[in-house]
Amino acid sequence: MIASTGKTNLLGLTQQEMEKFFDSIGEKRFRAGQVMKWIHHFGVDDFDAMTNVSKALREKLKACAEVRGPEVVSEDISSDGTRKWVVRVESGSCVETVYIPQGKRGTLCVSSQAGCALDCSFCSTGKQGFNSNLTAAEVIGQVWIANKSFGSVPATVDRAITNVVMMGMGEPLLNFDNVIAAMHLMMDDLGYGISKRRVTLSTSGVVPMIDELSKHIDVSLALSLHAPNDALRNQLVPLNKKYPLKVLLESCRRYMSSLGEKRVLTIEYTMLKDINDKVEHAVEMIELLKDTPCKINLIPFNPFPHSGYERPSNNAIRRFQDLLHQAGYNVTVRTTRGEDIDAACGQLVGQVMDRTRRSERYIAVRELSADVDTAPAAATRT
């Protein structure tokens, strides 16, 4: 456990919360914007470095507040430019944050929980069980740490982080309030100023919270589907027993239509040899998604010891992709980046992180990043 100081951590406060904090200590609300810029634009955690803040206020802040992100355990850089941070949160658990560069884009994959309670059969993270929800400061702190590492100012055109995906450890919708607060900071001009189209939340399908999402925020949505029928998805994603596909896809369509503009759902589909990669599965998927504006990411499974699953052949993957293409869907197949640092750090977070989920995230993150600007409307089934 990391000892708590009892002070208010300003790192995770939204603009509204920051203004209320300054009210509570008898200061003007405009101070909130000043301090937020120092924290998020310049990565400052020392109040004495906030030079446009009076000395008296700095002393007051030192007495009752702090700026504290997760503790960086390690930072590794792959030969392809991918970066991975292992960070320790207040519960004592470690989580991962991954940065994937691609041309002028830089996508950061952020964790929302330590461990996971969903127990998906092809993902050993769930087998470790759930440890804790991350605080808003620990979620946005991953962006803060990465930004500081690059020495990048968020508001500038050459900033390192252009996209963020909530696709790290955990189910974001099961840590709803903290994830919402962190995503607001990602998009706030006093925070990181990232476009709503470039912030993506990935979910396994917590239907009530998908319905709640549109009341609180407007971000892109990705669904971890992995099966084209309920019987198979019940095996792969046990959450499906509670929220079957018909109900789940209806909730996704409601959310997408609530955005009031032409946006599409991203479907993530991990391909498992002889499990969900056959022609009949592609045919079922075509029928399942016919009323859902979407694009599809096919993610070849990356085996890990004792998983019980294998990666399909390249021919099987291409055949599956071709069938979906012929039906009018925009479909991509992606390969992993950062494999060399994946292996190097696997043991460090072995109790809370597995190789398969990392592979799935790296691939999907890369595609989501590329998707923002390049996918023509005509190429997407609507």
UniProtKB/Swiss-Prot annotation:
Which catalytic residues are annotated? 96, 345
Give the Pfam families listed for this entry: Radical_SAM, RlmN_N
E.C. code:
2.1.1.192
Provide the top EC class: transferase
Q: Which cysteines are joined by disulfide bonds?
A: 109-345
Cellular component (GO) terms are: cytoplasm
Domain of life of the organism in this record? Answer: Bacteria
Chief location = cytoplasm
List the SUPFAM superfamilies hit by this protein, alphabetically: Radical SAM enzymes (SSF102114)
Q: What else is known?
A: Reaction proceeds by a ping-pong mechanism involving intermediate methylation of a conserved cysteine residue.
Q: What is this protein called?
A: Dual-specificity RNA methyltransferase RlmN
Taxonomic classification, please?
A: Bacteria, Pseudomonadati, Pseudomonadota, Gammaproteobacteria, Pseudomonadales
